[in-house]
Amino acid sequence: KTFVEEINSEELVLNGKKRWVGNASLAGLLIVWAKNPKNKNIEGYLVDAKTPGVTVNIIQGKLSLRMVQNCDIEFKNVKIKKSDKLTKANNFQESVSRSLLFSRLGVSLGAVGASLGIYDEAVKYCTERVQFGKRLTSFQLTQTKLAKIMANSQAMLLYSKRMGEMYLKGKATGGNIGMLKAWCTEKARENAMLGRELLGGNGILIENNIMKHMLDIETLHTYEGTYDINMLVAGKELTGINALR
């Protein structure tokens, strides 16, 4: 939890912690959402990363999406100016919900890319691998699993394309995009499982990339809203009943 309080007519003090902030270690400026006890709103502020009291630490030991330096940030009596408040960032829910439409759409397409990467690795391996005097691609079960991965991937791509078109027209809702993100990442997990099975024991080797895709997909399935939360957002729109507690 992060809070901002008034010191005087020109300054505020910021206290709290944030976790899993992407590439914060590289940032010169931080966009920080903090609760204002005075008006009960969660507001957005622009904070210089070098301001005294700001501590940024890279989260170590990640197995997934390692290209992103996720960080813990602590704010301890950080003084900022009232003018550092982002003018239109007065309500976290309203402000972030709009950006989540775009980011969740991007995650869905990321799941498509990972799935197609899995297919490429699997079909290459199964074409080259010979067992019982035959290439793996000549076996029925191999073809069935490859076809399932491709069918899932094509469905994910077309679904994402449709939602992207609705987004550009301003017609996509939070439920539309939430359901898309949840469904695509769920199918991507299935694709990763099938791809790993096709490579047998070799599927766990780094050189074959399947496990890398699998681990990255686990992050896609969780961030920008978990599967359950996104489906509940969709469920609220479908039924008119808010089951989020």
Regions found by a protein language model. Give the residues of each.
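Flexible, small-/acidic-enriched active-site or ligand-binding loops
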Residues: E5, K50-K81
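Hydrophobic/aromatic beta-strand elements that line small-molecule binding cavities or substrate pockets
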Residues: K1-F3
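Short beta-strand-to-turn element immediately C-terminal to the catalytic PLP-Schiff-base lysine
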Residues: E5, V32-K35, L46-D48, E74-K76, ...
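Alpha-helical interface subdomain recognition
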Residues: I7-L12, R98-R245
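A short core secondary-structure module
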Residues: E11, N15-V56
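Solvent-exposed alpha-helices and their adjacent loops that cap or buttress functional pockets
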Residues: E5-E6, G22-L26, N36-N39, L63-M67, ...
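Long, acidic (Asp/Glu-rich), low-complexity accessory segments flanking structured domains
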Residues: K76-S95
